[in-house]
């Protein structure tokens, strides 16, 4: 019997997943509702339409997103092949002519003899091997189906995330490890502020520029998740009873309670990343770096994921997904793209690549691939399936997700080069075994 897989959604992840399947001789039924039913963000009927920027970000190997793109090239990614062919001058970044980019992918995928395209909205999850790659604007009917499958509490409709910081960039001389009232183990890094420091920070925060909202995002805001800058505008003391509450956080150096305290909570199993507790924000990225850099200890903080608040549909992957992108409760069902909690065009495509390879292996009754954590593709899969279940938020690829090198290297560029070299050696070994 001919082996086949349903792929729902022909965005970046779905197109990549479909390509990886047909490359391995597996028939694909590809479902895409556009143009029969449009989303509020898409404008064409093309596959892998880029709805926001035309940049796929940095190309160099001293940047994690450059490494993931190189890994994808090694694994014959259709998305990266299209991007390389449609590239436009952009300095050290990979930017594309968006029409040429999506046109190339549409042509290659649609016209492949093993692909059957169904232009219709999917409202029920089909039987049999399936990849769901319906993106951040998944239609309500299908979102309801996913909710039934994963459990209501594990599907989210908007993304409200605080910035995440690389631990190595925090000034440890200015912060201290402590939990409020010393309850349990000392689990938080605390950034103490004097009244003068707090007042200066407050003034900068309430006058900082916020990012513009897209029309289709406006209804999702403030459902019990208020941006820090909105909270601050309610009064100078409001944050002191919220995320900057100093009670129970006496500074062990002075024995006194600071005027205000920001807590940083460990965000990954390896303890290399920390998030700013309660600091979900809609400030522009440059403003986040400037304003949050006024907090003692964070003057030179390396923000690996800026705070965002936007419309998104994603599952609680640490609870419901395997590192192979399979649903824990139904092993012939895979998820890919932003729906899984990976953030960004390239990351979405990379998850589609991994899901496509694994869905092909599943129908061929071969062993599924868990990408090594030292690869960029593997580090993302590892993060989204092992991050905190309670505070899970989508994540871009970054070197903070990679396991540390055996030998510690202080110089950032050299460290990144070594991480990249290790990642590419590992992905080549994976490619040889596929």
From Swiss-Prot:
FAD binds at residues 9-14. GO terms for cellular component: cytosol. GO terms for biological process: tRNA methylation; tRNA wobble uridine modification. Its main location: cytoplasm. Keywords: Cytoplasm, FAD, Flavoprotein, Methyltransferase, NAD, NADP, Transferase, tRNA processing. It catalyses: uridine(54) in tRNA + (6R)-5,10-methylene-5,6,7,8-tetrahydrofolate + NADH + H(+) = 5-methyluridine(54) in tRNA + (6S)-5,6,7,8-tetrahydrofolate + NAD(+); uridine(54) in tRNA + (6R)-5,10-methylene-5,6,7,8-tetrahydrofolate + NADPH + H(+) = 5-methyluridine(54) in tRNA + (6S)-5,6,7,8-tetrahydrofolate + NADP(+). Its EC number is 2.1.1.74. It is found in: Cytoplasm. The keyword Nucleotide-binding does not apply. GO terms for molecular function: flavin adenine dinucleotide binding; tRNA (uracil(54)-C5)-methyltransferase activity, 5,10-methylenetetrahydrofolate-dependent. Its cofactor is FAD. PROSITE patterns: GIDA_2. Catalyzes the folate-dependent formation of 5-methyl-uridine at position 54 (M-5-U54) in all tRNAs. Belongs to the MnmG family. TrmFO subfamily. This is Methylenetetrahydrofolate--tRNA-(uracil-5-)-methyltransferase TrmFO. It comes from Listeria monocytogenes serotype 4b (strain F2365). The lineage of its organism: Bacteria, Bacillati, Bacillota, Bacilli, Bacillales.
């Amino acid at each position: 019997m001919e082996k086949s897989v349903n792929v729902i959604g022909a965005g970046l992840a779905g197109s990549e997943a479909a390509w990886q399947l047909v490359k391995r001789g597996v028939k694909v039924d590809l479902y895409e509702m556009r143009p029969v039913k449009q989303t509020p963000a898409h404008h064409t009927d093309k596959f892998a339409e880029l709805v926001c920027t035309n940049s796929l970000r940095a190309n160099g190997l001293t940047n994690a997103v450059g490494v993931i793109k190189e890994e994808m090239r090694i694994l014959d990614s259709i998305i990266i092949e299209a991007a390389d062919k449609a590239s436009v001058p952009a300095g050290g970044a990979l930017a594309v002519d968006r029409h040429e980019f999506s046109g190339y992918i549409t042509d290659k995928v649609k016209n492949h003899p093993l692909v059957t395209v169904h232009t219709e909205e999917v409202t029920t999850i089909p039987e049999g091997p399936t990849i769901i790659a319906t993106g951040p604007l998944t239609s309500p009917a299908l979102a309801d189906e996913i909710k039934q499958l994963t459990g209501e509490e594990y599907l989210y409709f908007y993304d409200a995330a605080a910035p995440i910081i690389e631990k190595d960039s925090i000034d440890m001389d200015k912060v201290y490890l402590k939990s409020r009232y010393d309850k349990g183990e000392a689990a938080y890094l605390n950034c103490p502020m004097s009244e003068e420091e707090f007042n200066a920070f407050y003034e900068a925060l309430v006058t900082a520029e916020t990012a513009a909202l897209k029309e289709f995002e406006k209804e999702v805001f403030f459902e019990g998740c208020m941006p820090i800058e909105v909270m601050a505008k309610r009064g100078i003391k409001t944050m002191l009873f919220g995320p900057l509450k100093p009670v129970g956080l006496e500074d062990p150096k002075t024995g006194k309670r600071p005027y205000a305290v920001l807590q940083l909570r460990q965000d990954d199993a390896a303890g290399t990343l920390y998030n700013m507790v309660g600091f979900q924000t809609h400030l522009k990225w440059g403003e986040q770096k400037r304003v949050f850099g006024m907090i003692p200890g964070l003057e030179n903080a390396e923000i690996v994921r800026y705070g965002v608040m936007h419309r998104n549909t994603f599952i609680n992957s640490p609870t419901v997904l395997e590192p192979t992108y399979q649903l824990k409760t139904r092993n012939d069902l895979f998820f890919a793209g932003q729906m899984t909690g990976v953030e960004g065009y390239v990351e979405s495509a990379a998850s589609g690549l991994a899901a496509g390879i694994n869905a092909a292996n599943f129908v061929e009754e071969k062993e599924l691939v868990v990408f090594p954590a030292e690869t960029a593709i593997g580090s993302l899969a590892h993060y989204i399936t092992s991050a905190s279940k309670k505070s899970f938020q989508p994540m871009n690829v970054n070197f903070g997700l990679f396991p540390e090198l055996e030998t510690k290297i202080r110089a950032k560029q050299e460290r990144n080069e070594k991480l990249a070299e290790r990642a590419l050696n590992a992905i080549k070994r994976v490619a040889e075994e596929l």
